[in-house]
């Protein structure tokens, strides 16, 4: 019975070293703080294979440390199994969404609801821009967007 009440979310971006690990860490903290972490399976992944095996970008790690949010992740690429086992796959931009929809069409047993994480933003900022070529303030912007979106998503999905 407990198995049925477990929900799952996979956060996805291009390389799985900037945006999606931040979203994953933010969401983990939210469900931990609300004592519902045992009800959620949370992970993140990349649409590409560029960064597989790498840790999150050091600027993202610094940002999370400043906010007191633990972050430990190793970049991985999304798999066919992810589409069949996650309830939600939340991505960061239109390019991610196109890639995910294309990949999901190749999976017969896709059960995941694929959406932009930004679609949950109360401030209506639909796209979470890649901060890779930016600076610390760009990572802070991503963090703030992820906090708003993850809170709203949890409210709806809980």
Curated annotation (Swiss-Prot):
Phosphorylated by LCK. Phosphorylation at Tyr-132 increases its phosphatase activity. Its main location: cytoplasm. Keywords: Acetylation, Cytoplasm, Hydrolase, Phosphoprotein, Protein phosphatase. Its EC number is 3.1.3.48, 3.1.3.2. The modification N-acetylalanine is found at residue 2. The modification Phosphotyrosine is found at residues 132-133. It comes from the Eukaryota. It catalyses: O-phospho-L-tyrosyl-[protein] + H2O = L-tyrosyl-[protein] + phosphate; a phosphate monoester + H2O = an alcohol + phosphate. InterPro entries: LMW_PTPase, Ptyr_pPase, Ptyr_pPase_sf, Tyr_Pase_low_mol_wt_mml, Tyr_phospatase_low_mol_wt. GO terms for molecular function: acid phosphatase activity; non-membrane spanning protein tyrosine phosphatase activity; protein tyrosine phosphatase activity. One of its GO terms (cellular component) is cytoplasm. Belongs to the low molecular weight phosphotyrosine protein phosphatase family. This is Low molecular weight phosphotyrosine protein phosphatase.
